Each structure stands twice: as structure tokens, then as C-alpha cells.
UniProtKB/Swiss-Prot annotation:
The modification Phosphoserine is found at residue 5. Zn(2+) binds at residues 119, 142. Residues 16-28 have a biased composition (Acidic residues). This is Carbonic anhydrase-related protein. It comes from Mus musculus. Expressed only in Purkinje cells.
Length: 291
């Protein structure tokens, strides 16, 4: 299965009728530079129901039906997880079968946890992709799941209705997050794009801030990275995780380029501010599982 550079491999460039077109698009690079218009290359980025969004908590609609079937992450400890710097983010690829069900997800369907991705700012005043009442957090984690009941792979699920579910976790600065130490301790070894390292153990359960899993918002949106395909159910937890200043600084030492690469003028090569601007809500409704 491709890693969520699956974005840069199979999924970002769906099958075309013309092989030449497919070959041409596979070489397309994308980034977070100011003024970059993803929609010129990735048409889905021009969709009406894009992510991320600003979440206005006062306008969120309480939906008690979200609690009829409790949101149930059945996560298991992952052995030998691969952590990769893909030049856009840090990915933790999970090989153990962890699944998510219940809550806003279609009844009787399971969503398999594929990977964890990180978005962070160069400064603590920004970094999260979503904002709450226009407040940004220093970091946001995405737990990306695909519908393993309806589809055979994440590549098949992307862009399909009920294909992808993403848990978003805001991150604030405070005490050290013990569950993320396995990742932050090896970031110096994967400082450059294309570097990977296997960690012996990673427990995704440590990323869930609320043991009751009741305080969350839900809306329908898209991937926040190209191809920006829609059909994504977003579950955003109300209460943030906490990591230390030292831990987030480890992310800020990462680079967007391969070691020894010549940088273009005006680019310092630092990996950070890797968040997409918020997109219009349009006519979407944000639901809340709490009052």
C-alpha cells in the first residue's frame, strides 16, 4: 500500500484516459509557499466542500444522535512503525490493524487507521490547519482512516463518499507528551526529505485526549493536501493534546529538501508552516456531540 505520499503517488494523480497525461502530472510538485494555487493543478482543490475550516463553536449544532452509538477507536499498539519525512510533513505509518467505528460514521462500517500526520507552525501562534473561533494552535495531528468495509485500500477510498475519516487533534504547549516521545526522539535522524526510521513501538491510544470520546465536532470536507479530494468525515476533538516546547522544536529543525540539495533563492529549507489556509464553510453544518 502506498504511503500517504500516496498523495504524491497513486492517489494524487488518479487514472487518466491518456497515459501521457498521467506521466506528465506525476512529476508535479506542490508546497505551502505563499500564493501557490493548488487548484490550478489539482481540480478537486476548487471544490465547494474543502478543508480545513474555521470552526465557530457558537454556530455548531448539537446532535444527540452522535451519541447513540459511541465513537469507538479500537486501536492497538503498533510494532515497527515507519516514521518518514516526506518534505511536507512527518508521517507515522501504522502496520497494526487499528479501526474506528461509531459516532458519525456509517453504522456497521469500520475505518482502518492508516497513518498519523503532523502540521505545525514556525512559531507557537500558528500551525494548526483548522481554527476554533479564529484561534490557531501551534500544531494539529491528523489520524487518517479509510473505510475498510467498503474498499480494499486507501487508494480506492480516497474521493469516494464515506471513504475517509480523519480525527483532528489540536496541540498546545505545556508538559511533555510521553506518547509522542517515540517520534520526537528520532526526528534528528530523519531531518531531511526522504529519510525514514523504524520505531519499535507506537501507541495511537495515547493521542486520544478524552476517555469518554464525547466532546467533538463533526463536518464533511476534504483532504487538506493535494489532491484535496472530498468525501472526508472530519472529527475534531474539543480538548487539545499537550506537548513540550522542546518537543515542538524538534519538528522545527526538519527540512523540506534532501541533504545537500541546492535551495532556490528565498527558501531556507525549513519544514514548518505546513498548513493550508481555512476554506469557506459554504452551506455545511458543523455538528457537536456535546452541549
Amino acid at each position: 500500500m502506498a504511503d500517504l505520499s500516496f498523495i504524491e503517488d497513486a492517489v494524487a494523480f488518479p487514472e487518466k484516459e491518456e497515459d501521457e497525461e498521467e506521466e506528465e502530472e506525476e512529476g508535479v510538485e506542490w508546497g505551502y509557499e505563499e500564493g501557490v494555487e493548488w487548484g490550478l493543478v489539482f481540480p478537486d482543490a476548487n471544490g465547494e466542500y474543502q478543508s480545513p475550516i474555521n470552526l465557530n463553536s457558537r454556530e455548531a449544532r448539537y446532535d444527540p444522535s452522535l451519541l447513540d452509538v459511541r465513537l469507538s477507536p479500537n486501536y492497538v499498539v503498533c510494532r515497527d512503525c515507519e516514521v518518514t519525512n516526506d518534505g511536507h510533513t512527518i508521517q507515522v505509518i501504522l502496520k497494526s490493524k487499528s479501526v474506528l467505528s461509531g459516532g458519525p460514521l456509517p453504522q456497521g462500517q469500520e475505518f482502518e487507521l492508516y497513518e498519523v500526520r503532523f502540521h505545525w507552525g514556525r512559531e507557537n501562534q500558528r500551525g494548526s490547519e483548522h481554527t476554533v473561533n479564529f484561534k490557531a494552535f501551534p500544531m494539529e495531528l491528523h489520524l487518517i482512516h479509510w473505510n475498510s468495509t467498503l474498499f480494499g485500500s486507501i487508494d480506492e477510498a480516497v474521493g469516494k463518499p464515506h471513504g475517509i475519516a480523519i480525527i483532528a487533534l489540536f496541540v498546545q504547549i505545556g508538559k511533555e507528551h510521553v506518547g509522542l516521545k517515540a517520534v520526537t526522539e528520532i526526528l534528528q535522524d530523519i531531518q531531511y526529505k526522504g529519510k525514514s526510521k523504524t520505531i519499535p513501538c507506537f501507541n495511537p491510544n495515547t493521542l486520544l485526549p478524552d476517555p469518554l470520546l464525547r466532546d467533538y465536532w463533526v463536518y464533511e470536507g476534504s483532504l487538506t493536501i493535494p489532491p484535496c479530494s472530498e468525501g472526508v468525515t472530519w472529527i475534531l476533538f474539543r480538548y487539545p493534546l499537550t506537548i513540550s516546547q522542546m518537543q515542538i522544536e524538534e519538528f522545527r529543525r526538519l527540512r523540506t529538501h534532501v541533504k545537500g540539495a541546492e535551495l532556490v533563492e528565498g527558501c531556507d529549507g525549513i519544514l514548518g508552516d505546513n498548513f493550508r489556509p481555512t476554506q469557506p464553510l459554504s452551506d455545511r453544518v458543523i455538528r457537536a456531540a456535546f452541549q
